[in-house]
Amino acid sequence: MATVQQLEGRWRLVDSKGFDEYMKELGVGIALRKMGAMAKPDCIITCDGKNLTIKTESTLKTTQFSCTLGEKFEETTADGRKTQTVCNFTDGALVQHQEWDGKESTITRKLKDGKLVVECVMNNVTCTRIYEKVE
C-alpha cells in the first residue's frame, strides 16, 4: 500500500479518459472544456507531515492549493468554482472531496504500477487520468 510520500513529486499526464464528460457534469462551459482537453498538465504533489500542496501546471493555466490533511478549506478550482474541500489519505490513496452549491465531487489519487492514477467522480460520471513520474 502506498504512502503519501510515494505520491510526492512531479507527474506528467499521459492518458485521459472521460475528462470532457466529467467537466460537463461539473458545469464547465464548452470553451473551457476544449482548453482543458488540450492541456497536458504536470501535477506536483508535496507533503510535509499533514501539510499537503498540489500544484497543476500547464501551458494554459497553473493552479495550486495547500491544506492540512483532514481539515476542510475553501478551494478555488481551475474552472473558478469555490468549493469546501477536505483531503484525506485513506487506504493508500489521497482522497479530495469537494462540495459546492449542493453538489459534490471526489478526486482520488493513487499509485498503480508506478503511475499516478487520478479518478474524478461526480454523480455517475467517472474520469480517469494517468500520470507518469518525471525524473
UniProtKB/Swiss-Prot annotation:
Family annotation (InterPro entries)? Calycin, Fatty_acid-bd, ILBP, Lipocln_cytosolic_FA-bd_dom
Q: Name one GO biological process term.
A: regulation of retrograde trans-synaptic signaling by endocanabinoid
Family indicated by similarity: Belongs to the calycin superfamily. Fatty-acid binding protein (FABP) family.
What subcellular locations does the record give?
Answer: Cytoplasm; Nucleus; Synapse; Postsynaptic density
Organism name? Homo sapiens (Human)
- The listed location of motif Nuclear localization signal is 24-34
Q: Which residues carry this modification: Phosphotyrosine?
A: 131
| SUPFAM superfamilies to which the protein is assigned, alphabetical | Lipocalins
Record's protein name:
Fatty acid-binding protein 5
Q: Where does (9Z,12Z)-octadecadienoate bind?
A: 129-131
GO function term, MF aspect, one: identical protein binding
Instruction: Provide a GO CC annotation, any one.
Output: nucleoplasm
Q: What is the lineage of its organism?
A: Eukaryota, Metazoa, Chordata, Craniata, Vertebrata
Residues where N-acetylalanine occurs? 2
Give the consequence of mutating residue 24 to A.
Answer: Loss of ligand-induced nuclear import
Keywords per UniProt? Acetylation, Cytoplasm, Disulfide bond, Lipid transport, Lipid-binding, Nucleus, Phosphoprotein, Secreted, Synapse, Transport
Tissue expr = Keratinocytes; highly expressed in psoriatic skin. Expressed in brain gray matter.
- Superkingdom, taxonomy of origin: Eukaryota
